[in-house]
């Protein structure tokens, strides 16, 4: 059998040659050769190694680094169920075009179907949820196989970036001679693959009542479209993680405005990113009487209503004339009225609410800050916050919009962006990824502040059909799911500083200083009146 140490060295050398600079490792026995080579590469400053004991969290940490940095990031595990624990992060990476590189250690192929310990058929475990997968058995093939996987991960030729899987068969002995760890890695080269040309640009004609709908997108993309919409006087309906939600064109109450008369007059929608948050937007994107232009650099695109008229790499908005400026002013006037109503409602609502927490958190952050927002209610609460001239970089896992792995993702975003991160999460989201509060004493701690909106359960369900009075009897047990967990004790178990607040003033004080290390701010809110608040917000102005 090939030498396991040489194989591991070939894999790490090829990852480095292909531009990988961050690797997340979950320890194990079969992956020992990879772990030791990665440790040496980290020691020598060749890469940055992050060690976590929970594979699910490790996968989301790698996802966060890749999401914020735009570079491929590897996550390394041992064999067996360890690999399967990466599946949620792989799914999110697939649907959000994130270059996540799974490197799984495996037993030699001859041991499959023999009952050997921690041995299963894991080469194609992720099936259709990775862009490419291969098995590596020989160090001589490492640069070729890893190079092609990295091309698939970055979408350089396919224009479809996403996760890939390298399964590495490692035979005993698994621990190399210590002298090998001091030797330089082999010099390898991966094939240079230039990015596929992007050249389809559509120039949009004037005279059509146009809006831009911006969904989840990287900061550079969102900020570009915020500037374009402002220059063209086009109303901008931007979700928080679109990174377009700032400037004069963005409308903070757009999902409420879509329930009024303005929506009926829309003649064209330009879609950027991946919109997922609201039913009013979905209804708009499903209309057959509206010209729907989808702009994407990828080979897949957002079209949930199956109504797209054209999909292009880029679009040019027309120069604004009197008609365009009048159209924009109608939206701005409606926005001002809706904003005043929403703010008055929240200011007068008894007790602290999720939307109030969201607008307070946003107000505390500047354009150089980073915000990770959780799924469920937090991102929707942020979607009602006022729009300012600038905004922080906002990240979210909107590929599949799960609530798992978000603490780990926030930590990854901090490493990938190089900025302190504030994360706005629900209590159940924190509990889903509580293992991420456990960071070993040998691992550096990034500056991540977790603002946990604790309403003791799943309050988003109160705003949906099952939150109606007809379902009151089963609601708490099967939807509300109160847990009664002491978040202070949970944080203390991981050595994480904790602060509990119950008022807006206390929250503002807690947010006044930038994050230092990993810390938790628990914000206590009442879930009992969440449905009433949602109905009041959606009521006609």
Say what each PLM segment does.
Residues 92-93, 103, 110-123, 381, ...:
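Thiamine diphosphate
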Residues 1-3, 283-377, 486, 495, ...:
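Phosphate/pyrophosphate-binding active-site segments
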Residues 1-18, 143-205, 320-333:
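Cofactor-/ligand-binding subdomain signature composed of acidic, glycine-rich
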Residues 63, 67, 78-79, 214-307, ...:
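Glycine-rich, anion-gripping cofactor-binding loops and their flanking helix/strand elements
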Residues 3-88, 385:
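N-terminal cofactor/phosphate-binding cores enriched in small/glycine residues
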Residues 19-22, 67-77, 83-88, 92-104, ...:
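Structural signature of the thiamine diphosphate
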Residues 8-12, 29-35, 332-418:
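Active-site diphosphate/adenylate-binding microenvironment
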Residues 93, 104-149, 238-339, 440:
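Glycine-rich, acidic loop regions that bind phosphate or pyrophosphate groups
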């Amino acid at each position: 059998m090939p030498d396991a140490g040489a194989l591991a060295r070939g894999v790490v050398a090829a990852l480095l040659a292909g531009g990988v600079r961050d690797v997340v490792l979950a320890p194990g026995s079969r992956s020992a050769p990879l772990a030791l080579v990665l440790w040496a590469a980290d020691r020598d400053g060749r890469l940055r190694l992050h060690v976590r004991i929970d594979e699910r969290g490790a996968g989301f940490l790698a996802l966060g680094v890749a999401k914020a940095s735009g570079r491929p990031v590897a996550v390394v595990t041992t064999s067996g169920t360890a690999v399967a624990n990466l599946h949620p992060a792989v799914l999110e990476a697939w649907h959000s075009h994130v270059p996540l590189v799974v490197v799984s250690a495996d037993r030699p192929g001859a041991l499959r179907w023999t009952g050997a310990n921690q041995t299963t058929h894991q080469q194609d475990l992720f099936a259709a949820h990775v862009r490419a997968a291969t098995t590596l058995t020989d160090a001589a093939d490492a640069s070729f196989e890893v190079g092609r996987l990295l091309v698939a991960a970055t979408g350089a030729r396919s224009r479809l970036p996403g996760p890939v899987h390298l399964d590495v068969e490692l035979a005993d002995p698994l621990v190399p001679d210590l002298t090998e760890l001091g030797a330089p890695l082999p010099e390898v080269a991966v094939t240079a693959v230039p990015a596929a040309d992007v050249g389809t640009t559509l120039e949009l004609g004037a005279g059509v009542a146009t809006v831009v709908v911006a969904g989840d997108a990287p900061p550079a993309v969102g900020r570009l479209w915020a500037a374009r919409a402002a220059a063209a006087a086009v109303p901008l309906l931007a979700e928080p993680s679109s990174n377009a939600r700032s400037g004069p064109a963005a409308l903070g109450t757009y999902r409420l405005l879509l329930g009024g008369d303005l929506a009926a007059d829309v003649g064209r929608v330009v879609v950027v990113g991946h919109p997922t948050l609201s039913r009013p937007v979905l209804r708009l994107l499903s209309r057959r009487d509206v010209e729907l232009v989808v702009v994407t650099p990828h080979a897949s695109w957002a079209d949930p209503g199956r109504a797209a008229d054209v999909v292009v790499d880029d679009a040019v908005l027309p120069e604004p004339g009197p008609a365009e400026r009048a159209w924009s002013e109608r939206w701005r006037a409606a926005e001002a009225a809706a904003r005043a109503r929403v703010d008055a409602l929240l200011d007068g609502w008894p007790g602290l609410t999720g939307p109030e927490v969201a607008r307070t958190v946003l107000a505390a952050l500047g354009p150089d800050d980073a915000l990770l927002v959780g799924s469920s209610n937090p991102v929707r609460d942020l979607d009602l916050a006022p729009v300012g001239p600038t905004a922080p970089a906002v990240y979210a896992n909107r590929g599949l919009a799960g609530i798992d792995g978000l603490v780990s993702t926030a930590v990854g975003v901090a490493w990938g962006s190089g900025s302190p991160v504030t994360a706005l999460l629900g209590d159940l989201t924190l509990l889903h990824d509580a293992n991420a509060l456990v960071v070993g004493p040998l691992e550096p701690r990034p500056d991540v502040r977790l603002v946990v909106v604790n309403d003791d359960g799943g309050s988003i369900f109160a705003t949906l059909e099952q939150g109606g009075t007809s379902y009151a009897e089963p609601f708490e047990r099967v939807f509300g799911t109160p847990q009664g967990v002491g978040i202070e004790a949970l944080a203390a178990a991981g050595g994480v500083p904790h602060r509990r607040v119950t008022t807006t003033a206390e929250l503002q004080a807690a947010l006044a200083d930038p994050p230092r290390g990993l810390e938790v701010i628990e914000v206590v809110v009442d879930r009992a009146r969440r449905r009433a608040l949602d109905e009041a917000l959606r009521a006609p102005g």
